[in-house]
């Protein structure tokens, strides 16, 4: 059995760790509330934008979408992997990295590159895949404008023919304890074909076609922003859950160590009493 000093040191160490994990849990809980409010607020906008685009395109004849719907033979693929800059969030990053590798493996024989959003994904994926670009700073100021800049880079690469297909792998936020890994095709868009005519009393200027072609880049930027926002909220949810479990485990370990310490202390006192009694009896004899 370890001596009393060793047990006391372990109790002190575990207690310090417990204070850190508890503080991190509270910080993540506060950040989660803000991130959750942001993603909840933007989802109706993203859905309405998609609905508007579909309704307008349904009134048009033929195929609409221009370069963004160009269906080319897939030879070059870009995977956008959205992870975090920090760890201590359970399997949050690991799940995205695994899925990104699976998606890359599914394009065997083709050129597959990685666009890493988040330091953790870059650190791992660069060892086995070709990471062409890393974006770590967006989480410092997560705004639509900053996400739009990244989306514009991706659109430019596709339109220029650098890639025939672009996919996004990220964690979708459900609740604090649940994140779902999603693989979403970013480009090309599914061809927008005029179908059932949607009744509308709107007057369009300059034209429906031009409005649709303006909405498509806006929709793509919103799609990427939503994916990063989802991932950001999911990260804090995963970290809060992980730190909650770590705090519970540390509390349990500390209690076990205290029990062990008390037993060891009691045994030491008992031994001292026995030694004193034994010594007294020896003197009497």
Please annotate each region the language model reported:
Residues 1-285:
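C-terminal beta-strand-loop-alpha-helix "lid" module of Rossmann-like NAD(P)-dependent dehydrogenases
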């Amino acid at each position: 059995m370890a001596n009393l000093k060793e047990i006391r040191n372990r109790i002190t160490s575990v207690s310090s760790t417990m204070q850190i994990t508890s503080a991190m849990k509270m910080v993540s809980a506060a950040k989660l509330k803000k991130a959750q409010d942001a993603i909840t607020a933007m989802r109706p906008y993203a859905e309405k934008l998609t609905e508007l685009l579909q309704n307008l395109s349904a009134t048009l004849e033929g195929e609409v979408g221009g370069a963004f719907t160009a269906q080319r033979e897939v030879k070059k693929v870009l995977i956008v992997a959205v992870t975090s800059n920090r760890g201590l969030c359970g399997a949050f990053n690991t799940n995205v990295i695994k899925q990104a590798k699976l998606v890359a493996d599914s394009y065997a024989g083709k050129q597959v590159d990685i666009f890493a959003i988040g330091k953790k994904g870059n650190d791992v994926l660069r060892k086995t895949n070709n990471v062409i670009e890393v974006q770590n700073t967006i989480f410092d100021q997560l705004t639509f404008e900053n996400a739009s800049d990244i989306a514009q880079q991706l659109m430019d690469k596709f339109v220029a023919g650098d890639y025939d297909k672009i996919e996004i792998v990220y964690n979708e936020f459900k609740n604090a304890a649940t994140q779902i890994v999603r693989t979403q095709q970013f480009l090309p868009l599914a061809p927008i074909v005029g179908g059932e005519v949607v009744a509308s009393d709107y007057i369009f200027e300059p034209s429906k076609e031009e409005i649709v072609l303006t909405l498509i880049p806006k929709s793509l930027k919103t799609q990427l922003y939503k994916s990063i926002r989802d991932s950001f909220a999911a990260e804090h949810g995963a970290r809060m859950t992980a730190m909650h479990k770590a705090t519970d485990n540390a509390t349990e370990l500390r209690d076990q160590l205290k029990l062990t310490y008390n037993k060891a202390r009691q045994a030491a006192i008992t031994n001292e009493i026995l030694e004193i009694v034994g010594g007294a009896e020896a003197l009497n004899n």
